[in-house]
Amino acid sequence: MQTPMTIRDHLERARLVYGDRVGIYDEPDQPASSLGDLTYGQFYDLAQGMAAGLDDLGLEQGARVGIVSQNSARLLTTLFGASAWGRVAVPINFRLGPDEVEYIVDHSGCDVLILDPELEDTLGDIKVKHRFISGEESDSLFKVGAEARPWTPDENATATINYTSGTTARPKGVEMTHRNLWSNAAIFGWHTGVNDRDVYLHTLPQFHCNGWGMPYATTAMGVPQVNLRKVDGPEILRRIETYGVTLLCGAPAVVAAILDAAAEWDGEIPGKDRVRMVVAGAPPPTRTIERVETELGWEFIQIYGLTETAPLLTINRSRQEWDDDTPAARAAKLSRQGVPAVGITMATDPEGEVLARGNHILKSYWNNPEASAEALADDWFHTGDGGVIDDAGYLTLQDRKKDVIISGGENVSSIEVEDCLFSHPAVEEVAVIGVPDEKWGETVKALVVVGGDADVSERDLIDYCREKIAHYKCPTSVEFRQELARTATGKLQKFKLRAPYWEGVEKGIN
């Protein structure tokens, strides 16, 4: 027997098994009225009520429903209320400007747009058939108690469209099917051990890969979900303490905020020997990994993936064989991107690009057949990342292919140089880029944010690197910055950091 896998399965199970359990804790500090604490039974009723409200608006199945919001119970409701009854949720990055959001709304063909109240002034003029401000206005969609129009489940139907951040071009809309999301949720849940004794904290933006798919995995297992509107280190620790949080996800920048807050925390760090933190978005330095385990007492788990892969491709979680390792030795092993998740096949092509196959890799890019064909050429998904896979199956990223620095004919991995600089106690953030050089083609430049009141010079950091890595890999110059350009999910925007140095150069390499 075979039945279609759709995300309504997760919602139906939560209602049946955990209907009386508080499943959603809404953000109390938000411009809209908080929905408070919702049981999974109430959450189901809201989601179905939203589907019924969309019926009343005349939206056909397959219609797109956009939402631009920070983390909230209403955003979670939209992910299920739109998709679980046959429509398509389009969660949009709330940090984008009006032109960018308008492009996404227009390109995806949204019939409905729900806006965070803080964004009404900047995004309120975007043309769309039905616009609602999140809160009392959008709550008019919730026809609680009404039966939504039946939908014949189709696991190959598009459930969400998630727009990837563009570099030189417009962003692409990643189509995720119900099967994609279902597979990612199940596999993510297996590997991270999601169970009904967990409490999950939404530190990830829920627009980003649908909160990496955790809303589906946690809902299916009846896990209470705590919303957090804005990342703030001290507040994260407070909520972990208040709600008994056991699981959270984030980029390395979130880890840094938590470590900074922990240094000022009075008393034992909340969640010690209980919290599992899943990190992705950039390869974290080994020093950071070690600090998570020694200073916080939390388990560090690294994953690797992309929006196009829902996102889980690989996972690196401490193994029994590593139990007797020193924290530093274990951190070094955890700094790799990990082994393929269940159902994922990985390979590299002759140029070193990482390739992948699996059930949760995108259906296609929305209305972009050329990009879809390129990304899925030869029945592999082409990640655009360069890496190596060892005999045990562990992937180690070398760099984004376009970020490899070639100096004097030698390839330099910016990740390796960044990891070296991160180990210096004065360095809080760093980005390593290649800049044009008449003699060498490119030379290595480090852009550094110094932590606190630390006093360090350009010469100090260059000499520090020369003691640790091959001289040809070391920066020839260091520039100190107050901050580094990042995406909403914490990734360094190296194309922005490189651009000023390559102005007037015909190609982006020398």
What are the residue ranges of the model-derived segments?
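Conserved AMP-binding/adenylation subdomain of ANL enzymes
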Residues: 182-199, 207-247, 261-262, 318
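AMP-binding/adenylate-forming catalytic core of the ANL superfamily
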Residues: 96, 248, 358, 363-364, ...
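Conserved pre-ATP/AMP-binding loop-to-beta segment of ANL
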Residues: 4, 19-22, 146-163, 170, ...
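AMP-binding/adenylate-forming catalytic domain of the ANL superfamily
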Residues: 470-491, 510
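Conserved AMP-binding/adenylate-forming core of the ANL superfamily
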Residues: 3, 23-72, 76-80, 97-102
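ANL superfamily adenylate-forming
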Residues: 27-36, 118-155, 262, 328-330
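Conserved AMP-binding A3 loop
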Residues: 37-42, 159-183
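Conserved AMP-binding/adenylate-forming
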Residues: 223, 277, 284-303, 307-395, ...
